[in-house]
Amino acid sequence: MLSENVKKISMVEKVGYASGDFACNLIYATVSTYLLFFYTDVFGLSAAAAGTMFLVVRIIDALADPFIGTIVDRTNSRFGRFRPYLLFGAFPFVILAILCFTTPDFSDMGKLIYAYITYVGLSLTYTTINVPYGALTSAMTRNNQEVVSITSVRMLFANLGGLVVAFFVPLLAAYLSDTSGNESLGWQLTMGILGMIGGCLLIFCFKSTKERVTLQKSEEKIKFTDIFEQFRVNRPLVVLSIFFIIIFGVNSISNSVGIYYVTYNLEREDLVKWYGLIGSLPALVILPFIPRLHQFLGKKKLLNYALLLNIIGLLALLFVPPSNVYLILVCRLIAAAGSLTAGGYMWALIPETIEYGEYRTGKRMGGLIYAIIGFFFKFGMALGGVVPGLVLDKFGYVANQAQTPAALMGILITTTIIPVFLLVLALIDINFYNLDEKKYKNMVRELENRDKVYLDHIDDFKA
């Protein structure tokens, strides 16, 4: 008879869990994609000031991750260890998102301070929700194939959220700006609508999921310094952390610079929504097949092929003239197919690193390990804010006017060369991942035996 820890999860619960990432993407993908543009072209910050702020905020947020992860792993409530954060974090997350897209009548310095305060607040609140949300997968099941399935549904919904953000947010912001006669108000109302939907979905996620995996008594002793032991003994975690930095760096750079590339290099501002849509569209086709691809190719081949596809699509953009819009969109589609495959599948590897950490140390640290991953991927996301801002400033970008050839070259380099360089590093890194299917199954069998011993003697442990 199968342990409850490894049984199949119902599709209702998978969808409920996935709705949490749809909610987060409605809000945070809007921030990642449009906040830099909002700050430079609507709010009134310089590209350099906005780019520097993105870096500073990401560093603060990333440094907070391990502390939040430790707190999460010490949580023991009637709602479970991870789920309470979805319930109680939803409201402040929505309010701070709206404040980020609000333009107060302050001086230039006052606006900069306001932007720092609201963006730091939003980022920390997002972390407080996202760390336990991600770790929740490891508490739902130990079945590796089910983890891949849950992650595939999650990434499908996340990318559906991305599609909404890419296609409808520009339309909605433009409509509300035109209707109100105020572009700043248009963006504020847009985020208000997205926030209300996202908040409700986070609560639905809380209601529809269940934590199953047994928590052993030793976990009561989890402390912040356990992070150093994990890096010493958990090689899959180290490799995956580096991989997350790179992939999030590439995706964040591409998202941030895409609106500049379409607006200025292609001179087709009307295509911004389509460029964004094509960047998310392959997810609808690819992600449902990730579990099958995982079974057929295995981890390394799947990720290697995905990264190579992304590289090919980006390099092709260098050779396509800006006037050939259709071919550019095809290149974008190819790059996105690779990016979405790698970016979707890598999340399924996090529960493996949690299991491996428990196997090596005897402590199950879902929150802390997910926070470690978060610490690194947020540095990757920081690249998406700081690199485009600093490169554009270096090449002489000036907002809301025709760009010089140097500025256009800076936009093109940021769109293609920089991401390709990072993807090559990702190819090298992921081939050091050493946890294959055979090792994983043996490890889970051992962990299940340990759980059985604990449950058989639970009264002795409590004594």
Swiss-Prot record:
Membrane as UniProt keyword: yes
Keywords, ordered alphabetically: Cell membrane, Membrane, Symport, Transmembrane, Transmembrane helix, Transport
Record membrane topology: Multi-pass membrane protein
Transmembrane segments: 21-40, 50-72, 84-104, 112-132, 156-176, 186-206, 237-257, 271-291, 311-331, 334-354, 367-387, 408-428
A Gene Ontology term for the protein's cellular component: plasma membrane
PROSITE patterns associated with the record: MFS, NA_GALACTOSIDE_SYMP
Cellular location(s): Cell membrane
Pfam families: MFS_2
NCBIfam families: gph
Organism of derivation: Bacillus subtilis (strain 168)
GO BP term, example: sodium ion transport
PANTHER family recorded: MAJOR FACILITATOR SUPERFAMILY (MFS) PROFILE DOMAIN-CONTAINING PROTEIN, MAJOR FACILITATOR SUPERFAMILY DOMAIN-CONTAINING PROTEIN
Gene3D superfamilies given in the database record: MFS general substrate transporter like domains
Protein name: Uncharacterized symporter YnaJ
Gene field: ynaJ
InterPro entries named in the record: MFS_2, MFS_dom, MFS_trans_sf, Na/Gal_symport, Na/Gal_symport_CS
GO molecular function: symporter activity
Family: Belongs to the sodium:galactoside symporter (TC 2.A.2) family.
